[in-house]
């Protein structure tokens, strides 16, 4: 079975929704940021500090190559920048969790914002959000409104995948 690939801006709920899909759909969840943190033994912030954004993006590219060669029937929750710098379409069916920037801000606590290096300046984060939207749209096969509950979104994505299998 093909992978389900979740893309969207930081804080759009990719990991949370991925967990719901995994539970409902008999798949396992792979969060690319968590995989990188475990492999490197550092937080995303620490990786950014030690190798910079370009170094982090190279690590993401290596992970994509590994995932594409070795993983099937999974839910892959990508980091927010992964589809900006890498083609993720060959990992599986790509779903963009589309939410307004304001909805994302409401969802994230201050502590969660501090864990995200690109959220250190809200106006820059908003600009980045606006720049990335068109790329998310190009990379995705499906655009899903991310303002519903995680369970509702997970069910919608599974429904889309069921239709893909039938076709």
Curated annotation (Swiss-Prot):
<dbReference type="GO" id="GO:0005524">
    <property type="term" value="F:ATP binding"/>
</dbReference>
<keyword id="KW-0547">Nucleotide-binding</keyword>
<comment type="pathway">
    <text>Metabolic intermediate biosynthesis; chorismate biosynthesis; chorismate from D-erythrose 4-phosphate and phosphoenolpyruvate: step 5/7.</text>
</comment>
<dbReference type="InterPro" id="IPR027417">
    <property type="entry name" value="P-loop_NTPase"/>
</dbReference>
<keyword id="KW-0963">Cytoplasm</keyword>
<dbReference type="GO" id="GO:0005829">
    <property type="term" value="C:cytosol"/>
</dbReference>
<keyword id="KW-0067">ATP-binding</keyword>
<dbReference type="GO" id="GO:0008652">
    <property type="term" value="P:amino acid biosynthetic process"/>
</dbReference>
<dbReference type="GO" id="GO:0009073">
    <property type="term" value="P:aromatic amino acid family biosynthetic process"/>
</dbReference>
<keyword id="KW-0418">Kinase</keyword>
<feature type="binding site">
    <location>
        <begin position="8"/>
        <end position="15"/>
    </location>
    <ligand>
        <name>ATP</name>
    </ligand>
</feature>
<dbReference type="GO" id="GO:0009423">
    <property type="term" value="P:chorismate biosynthetic process"/>
</dbReference>
<dbReference type="GO" id="GO:0004765">
    <property type="term" value="F:shikimate kinase activity"/>
</dbReference>
<keyword id="KW-0808">Transferase</keyword>
<dbReference type="InterPro" id="IPR000623">
    <property type="entry name" value="Shikimate_kinase/TSH1"/>
</dbReference>
<dbReference type="GO" id="GO:0000287">
    <property type="term" value="F:magnesium ion binding"/>
</dbReference>
<keyword id="KW-0057">Aromatic amino acid biosynthesis</keyword>
<comment type="similarity">
    <text>Belongs to the shikimate kinase family.</text>
</comment>
<dbReference type="Pfam" id="PF01202">
    <property type="entry name" value="SKI"/>
</dbReference>
<keyword id="KW-0028">Amino-acid biosynthesis</keyword>
<protein>
    <recommendedName>
        <fullName>Shikimate kinase</fullName>
        <ecNumber>2.7.1.71</ecNumber>
    </recommendedName>
</protein>
<dbReference type="InterPro" id="IPR031322">
    <property type="entry name" value="Shikimate/glucono_kinase"/>
</dbReference>
């Amino acid at each position: 079975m093909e992978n389900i690939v979740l893309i969207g801006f930081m804080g759009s709920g990719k990991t949370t929704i991925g967990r719901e899909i995994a539970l409902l759909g008999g798949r396992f969840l792979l969060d690319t940021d968590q995989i990188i943190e475990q492999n490197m033994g550092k937080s995303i912030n620490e990786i950014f500090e030690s190798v910079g954004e370009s170094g982090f993006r190279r690590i993401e590219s290596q992970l994509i190559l590994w995932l594409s060669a070795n993983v099937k029937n999974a839910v892959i929750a990508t980091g927010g920048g992964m589809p900006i710098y890498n083609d993720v379409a060959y990992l599986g069916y790509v779903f963009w969790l589309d939410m307004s920037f304001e909805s994302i801000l409401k969802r994230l606590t201050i502590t969660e914002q501090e864990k995200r290096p690109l959220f250190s300046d809200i106006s820059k984060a908003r600009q980045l959000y606006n720049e990335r939207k068109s790329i998310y749209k190009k990379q995705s096969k499906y655009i899903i409104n991310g303002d519903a509950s995680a369970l509702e979104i997970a069910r919608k994505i599974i429904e889309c995948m069921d239709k893909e299998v039938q076709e």
